[in-house]
Amino acid sequence: MELVHSATFPCKQKLLIAVTIATSLLTIIPLLYPLLEDPNFFLKQQPPSQSSIINLENGVVTSHDSCDIFSGEWVPNPEAPYYTNTTCWAIHEHQNCMKFGRPDTDFIKWKWKPYGCEDGLPVFDPVRFLEIVRGKTMAFVGDSVSRNHMQSLICLLSQVEYPMDASVKNDDYFKRWTYETYNFTIAAFWTPHLVKSKEPDQTQPKHIDIFDLYLDEADESWTADIGDFDFVIISSGHWHYRPSVYYENRTITGCHYCQLPNITDLTMFYGYRKAFRTAFKAILDSESFKGVMYLRSFAPSHFEGGLWNEGGDCLRKQPYRSNETQDETTMKLHKIQLEEFWRAEEEAKKKGKRLRLLDTTQAMWLRPDGHPSRYGHIPEANVTLYNDCVHWCLPGPIDNLNDFLLAMLKREEDKGFLAQVRKMLS
């Protein structure tokens, strides 16, 4: 089944012209001096940014977020999708729901509407995005859902340009692409636990399917390279459900569902908290990383009628209503992430590091209709396959994560302009 490309992006207003005026002011300040008595001089005729408001009062430039873009509900968007399953090569087969016969298309025709935001959350503008990241680098650090997110971004940007493969190693788990026109590089780093891990030895005839997780050692497969990137988006979640033995100081301290003698079951929540604490510490301790780190919060699965290996499925065709409760596990994982983020953020302020939160858990929890389910493979495939209620169809709800990402990048750009204005006026 092929989707119809149905919309183009509206032109976006330029960011605040206050900075331009401020620059001009420095060269003609004698002529404009009387105008400086007006505290709103830089804001006249200029609407607020969609993600922040800039004020100039008593000679002090300040900014505050105009609303919480992460609290809201899904509303119909008949203009979507903005790419199709036939126009984007970055879609992996198991996320190509249209190709494998998903009969409905309503699940791709929604957008996120934040509560109390006059301008809402604008749909993704690929040109605007590429202008912001011109000459910069961005890394997606995490598991296959992180890669799913990155592939969505590549598909959205394909309306403007296709990237060239710039990978430094022949490994599909560690890929890099460059948008040559914009000198923008995007990369994927595979690290499902964020910390150092050892997979079960599948070659043993009676292997035990248990991971070894070194909770106090960040995975060097990503920490060794983050200094090369301006933006790092980290996430992790579903792999922590798997049975694991926990190590700290290279000594076993407990496990999650390992069912091994003389080892205390500390639950997955213990390991999850420790893994994020270690990942944040690696960012904060890095002398080479000078960029912005974004935590993209947990994107929950939506199995109903059983677990992934017990016939569970996700067959809903509409989003949940905003007042429908999250499951207890998702709520607890989300709470742990926020607590560890806030803890790290306080330390980041002391060190001059920039940590930001993409708190998308509520939005993604409300989308049980967006997973591949049985439509991520050939229907008659003669192999044992499970319904996929973890990853997301492309196009699909995960595209909206990039609406959030662009909004956050705009905020960061606004903060940069504010710093320049303050410097000019000091």
Curated annotation (Swiss-Prot):
Transmembrane feature ranges: 15-35
Membrane topology: Single-pass type II membrane protein
InterPro entries, per database record: TBL (IPR029962), TBL_C (IPR026057), TBL_N (IPR025846)
GO molecular-function term, one example from the UniProt record: O-acetyltransferase activity
A single Gene Ontology CC term: membrane
Superkingdom of origin organism: Eukaryota
Protein family per UniProt: Belongs to the PC-esterase family. TBL subfamily.
Extra information: Contains 2 motifs that are conserved in esterases, but it is unlikely that this protein belongs to the catalytically active pectin esterases.
PANTHER family xrefs: PROTEIN TRICHOME BIREFRINGENCE-LIKE 19, PROTEIN TRICHOME BIREFRINGENCE-LIKE 9-RELATED
Name listed for the protein in its UniProt record: Protein trichome birefringence-like 19
Native organism taxonomy: Eukaryota, Viridiplantae, Streptophyta, Embryophyta, Tracheophyta
